[in-house]
Amino acid sequence: MTTLLQQQGSANLWERFCQWVTSTENRFYVGWFGVLMIPTLLTATICFILAFVAAPPVDIDGIREPVAGSLLYGNNIITAAVVPSSNAIGLHFYPIWDAANLDEWLYNGGPYQLIVFHFLLGIFSYMGREWELSYRLGMRPWIAVAYSAPVAAATAVLLVYSIGQGSFSDGLPLGISGTFNFMFVLQAEHNVLMHPFHMLGVAGVFGGALFSAMHGSLVTSSLIRETTETESQNSGYRFGQEEETYNIVAAHGYFGRLIFQYASFNNSRALHFFLAAWPVIGIWFASLAVACFAFNLNGFNFNQSLLDSQGRVINTWADILNRANLGIEAMHERNVHNFPLDLAAGDQAPVALQAPAING
């Protein structure tokens, strides 16, 4: 009898836990994806703060030349970063227990892997949690689909690029200046600016910002007057009201006359789908661009494509960009490589064209 009561009690406890996890009445929806999201994001956040503030220098290139990234080692908020794990580690999984001691783990950049893996699991779970909550509320799943764009971008620069290049030392440093360095090196080695997927990503980000500003300003300019001049116009809206708060006909008429009629949406649903889809598709393509770079599918090469009648090169902007790429490539990791890969890959010129003949 006692055993039966204990089993029922444990079953009831589990059922109550399941109901709490999946309840949409909580102030903060947890969900089954949240059970994974909360510990992984907390772990990544705590480790990031500790590493950003106090981590010792990391031998990122694997040549015993450590790079200091933390605040306590002389950096400021702009220059500080969590330095990627060492090139000596490569793509090996490097948890704390694989190192001989904590000092070795820190020297080889172990915190970077810990942060990146937990962070990626956390944002994947957050995306799943968005879908889960939408499902339980009877909503469509497009919030999670939209969030997949930044998730894909983060995965590309933190994981896919490292895998393609063969080492986590090639991943994105977790800091402001480190991000800029990553962008410069990516451009130098892969000609990012000449890749069509990057161009689509730029169109998505800047176009999305433009369309968002246009939409917000049009709506704000065509609000239905509900207040006096001495009141805030925001007081004219009541949360949950059924009537429209702005005049879409007026906004459509204004924008149609400003440009031309068919440049303006006359369907609010189509308009908002467009506002969501444009930047999301653009960032998807930007993520695909980084995935291409990971496996050295680089931007277009139009170097020295114009020649005069004498066969001399007429420089284009592609040639000037290529010169900048070579300069950046020559300067980064200067103690690892003697020459940029593009310069070192040519045919070797023999020192002696012909061995001297010895006449006895």
From Swiss-Prot:
Gene3D superfamilies in the record: Photosystem II protein D1-like
Alphabetical UniProt keywords: Calcium, Chlorophyll, Chromophore, Electron transport, Herbicide resistance, Iron, Magnesium, Manganese, Membrane, Metal-binding, Oxidoreductase, Photosynthesis, Photosystem II, Thylakoid, Transmembrane, Transmembrane helix, Transport
Propeptide span(s): 345-360
Main localization category: membrane
Residues at the site labelled Stabilizes free radical intermediate: 190
Pfam families linked to this entry: Photo_RC
Catalytically driven reaction(s): 2 a plastoquinone + 4 hnu + 2 H2O = 2 a plastoquinol + O2
Signal peptide boundaries: none
Site, Cleavage: residue positions: 344-345
Residues annotated to bind [CaMn4O5] cluster: 170, 189, 332-333, 342, 344
Cellular component GO terms, alphabetical: photosystem II; plasma membrane-derived thylakoid membrane
Other facts: Cyanobacteria usually contain more than 2 copies of the psbA gene. 2 of the reaction center chlorophylls (ChlD1 and ChlD2) are entirely coordinated by water.
Function: Photosystem II (PSII) is a light-driven water:plastoquinone oxidoreductase that uses light energy to abstract electrons from H(2)O, generating O(2) and a proton gradient subsequently used for ATP formation. It consists of a core antenna complex that captures photons, and an electron transfer chain that converts photonic excitation into a charge separation. The D1/D2 (PsbA/PsbD) reaction center heterodimer binds P680, the primary electron donor of PSII as well as several subsequent electron acceptors.
Protein name: Photosystem II protein D1 3
